[in-house]
Amino acid sequence: MRHGDISSSPDTVGVAVVNYKMPRLHTKAEVLDNCRRIADMLVGMKSGLPGMDLVVFPEYSTQGIMYDEQEMYDTAATVPGEETAIFSAACREAGVWGVFSITGEQHEDHPRKPPYNTLVLIDDHGEIVQKYRKILPWCPIEGWYPGDTTYVTEGPKGLKISLIVCDDGNYPEIWRDCAMKGAELIVRCQGYMYPSKDQQVLMAKAMAWANNCYVAVANAAGFDGVYSYFGHSALIGFDGRTLGETGEEEYGIQYAQLSISAIRDARAHDQSQNHLFKLLHRGYSGVHAAGDGDRGVADCPFEFYKLWVTDAQQARERVEAITRDTVGVADCRVGSLPVEQTLEA
């Protein structure tokens, strides 16, 4: 893991993250103009960072937040589509991989159902090699339709990459899911605003440490007339230490080289903090000393997760018993969310 240079090597993947200024757009034409600005920025960055293999732009950087519902539906994109075609051309021209935001991607039942909040990973040939739909939209504000799975893709130089979006990253489960599928770099694109800056910076570092993985965070910056976005895009090592972090500046860029051999060596040979290995080999030292085998215990000891998998409704009722049983809150209503119990559709 190296920071401070503009290079990369056969063993390192040069990764850049961008504090893209949150755009305020209203029409498809404005969105496509912004796509061209992103594409131009990517090509320019490659000339300044010749080692750059992968660049990450924040959530909402393509379309901004459409606060008008009709504008949201009117500008919802397809994947592939006009927006991704512009990004693909830039990736081909620069010979760079890129992560881009599509907010939103048309639902299969568009326009009867809300769009998805989507990320795409595009390779240096312009091919879309991963499309991820946000599993945990930022309720109660975000009205995106939720996705249902994570992915791992072999990225530049073979580094294994998963994509997650913003509020996804507040749930340890999604990081673990990506890591256990083999992700070595988890990319978190976010359009996070104040007040939760400190918490989001902390979460990314903690999840890198807990999952023995690299983390790349790209966050929006600036003010869009509604929210103030705190930036702090960052690259974090698999030991939880920050390699590089921007401030709050609009269009700030950070860059680091992520060693492929280092993370694979650590996962194979580290012991006391090898969290992925130890989770499925619980207590192996004591089990070995007892003469009960030398691989520890693999069974899941966490009753809540067992219940969630076998009886999701009962797990939901258990959560509601310690929180609330309505999605809305009477003292702080958001939109039309119900504040009284309703029947499931």
Curated annotation (Swiss-Prot):
The keyword Transferase does not apply. InterPro entries: Aliph_Amidase/BUP, Aliphatic_amidase, C-N_Hydrolase, C-N_Hydrolase_sf. The active site is at residues 59, 134, 166. One of its GO terms (molecular function) is amidase activity. Its EC number is 3.5.1.4. It is an enzyme of class 3 (hydrolase). Catalyzes the hydrolysis of short-chain aliphatic amides to their corresponding organic acids with release of ammonia. NCBIfam families: PRK13286.1. Belongs to the carbon-nitrogen hydrolase superfamily. Aliphatic amidase family. This is Aliphatic amidase. The gene is amiE.
